[in-house]
UniProtKB/Swiss-Prot annotation:
Keywords, ordered alphabetically: Amino-acid biosynthesis, Aminotransferase, Histidine biosynthesis, Pyridoxal phosphate, Transferase
Reactions listed under catalytic activity: L-histidinol phosphate + 2-oxoglutarate = 3-(imidazol-4-yl)-2-oxopropyl phosphate + L-glutamate
Enzyme class: transferase
Family according to the record: Belongs to the class-II pyridoxal-phosphate-dependent aminotransferase family. Histidinol-phosphate aminotransferase subfamily.
Name the UniProt record assigns to this protein: Histidinol-phosphate aminotransferase 2
């Protein structure tokens, strides 16, 4: 029996937090795991052995170097961060989103993003006490420029997020629409920081990184998770040092551990291997999309990510039938009305994709 008085919890913990549910990660043991947009490929055995030796030299008894200078320099080199721009590291991009919300949390401040979109934009805003304003996409998941500009004028957001490509829809927003939003946020409509979230850039091969020098209100955020390093939890944001100097003030000390730093440095030294894996997944994406779309009643939406969004006649039923066949995907149909009967499927290895397509066909026929 618990010795905790529930009334004490009610007194201490915020009402909105008590009303929430914790982020749920489903058990994937024994399943073909296609729910979390992970890169299915590990490093080749020779590189794994080399990495193990490298990690064996890491001084676990010492705190990390707070500035992570070597890793930041390597990221700027490999990811072609423009001269004069800097990078700030986070324990995954989730932490960077939280830092942005915390740093911008003035009374009455708001965060804005198209919806459906990445759930952490809204969650981090709520945790920090900011209001989140979601602006619906069009029915085909394209960006509604007019609606965005009108909402920006009305709400005057502190931060506007644009995911490129978007999660969970997978599409790239029109570049002209995005530029109109960035320019409008420079003062003609509102004065806002625009954060372009490029978590899936390895699969999109499109980027706003080179535009950082064009706009003083622009940051570009990425993660190494989708490159095949989800287990080390490393995200980074690139932009003008004046912005990053402010974010650094709310960054937890030693937030990137020594094993993460060493692993990321090693992987960036062998980025050609990761690029090859991304190319394989892009090729598989086309094959899986064609296989899914071959079934009547199934609509597969264009994707520039390592996952596919599809609308099926009955999302809940199809999800359950796939799970019964040991295939785990993501049922996103309850996330937003625009996602009615939609499922999100991670693109994986040829073998796992074949298992999925076979199970998918059978699930539609049951």
């Amino acid at each position: 029996m618990s010795v905790v008085d529930p009334s004490l919890i009610e007194r201490i913990i915020r009402d909105d937090v008590r009303a929430m549910g914790a982020y749920h990660v489903p058990d994937s043991h024994g399943l073909v795991k296609l729910d979390a947009m992970e890169n299915p490929y590990r490093l080749p055995p020779a590189l794994r052995s080399e990495l193990a030796a490298r990690l064996g030299e890491v001084a676990l008894n010492r705190y990390p170097v707070p500035s992570s200078e070597a890793l930041r320099a390597k990221l700027k080199e490999v990811m072609q961060v423009p001269a004069g721009m800097e990078v700030l590291l986070g324990n995954g991009s989730d932490e960077i989103i939280s830092m942005l919300a915390l740093a911008a949390a003035r009374p009455g401040a708001k965060v804005m993003a198209p919806v459906p979109g990445f759930v952490m934009y809204a969650m981090s805003a709520q945790f920090a006490g900011l209001e989140f304003v979601g602006v619906p996409l069009r029915a085909d998941f394209t960006l509604d420029r007019g609606a965005m500009l009108a909402a920006m004028a009305e709400h005057q957001p502190a931060i506007v997020y644009l995911a490129y490509p978007n999660n969970p829809t997978g599409n790239l927003f029109d570049a002209a629409d995005m530029e109109a939003i960035v320019r409008a946020a420079q003062g003609s409509v509102c004065r806002s920081l625009v954060v372009v979230d490029e978590a899936y850039q390895p699969f999109a091969q499109e980027s706003w990184m080179s535009r950082l020098t064009d706009f003083g209100n622009l940051l570009v955020m990425r993660t190494v998770s989708k490159l095949g390093l989800a287990g080390i939890r490393l995200g980074y944001v690139a932009g003008d040092p004046q912005w990053l100097e402010q974010l650094d003030k709310v960054r937890p000390p030693y937030n990137v551990n020594v094993l993460t730093e060493a692993t990321a440095l090693f992987a960036l030294e062998h980025v050609a291997v990761l690029d090859e894996q991304a190319a394989q997944l892009r090729a598989e994406r086309s094959r899986v999309a064609e296989g899914m779309a071959a079934h009547g009643g199934v609509t597969v939406f264009p994707s520039a990510a390592n996952f596919l969004l599809a609308r099926v006649p009955d999302a809940a039923q199809t999800f359950d039938r796939l799970l019964a066949r040991k295939v785990l995907i993501k049922n996103v149909s309850k996330m937003h009305p625009l996602l009615a009967n939609c499922l999100r499927v991670t693109v994986s290895t040829p073998e796992e994709n074949a298992q999925f397509l076979e199970a998918f066909a059978a699930s539609l026929q049951d």
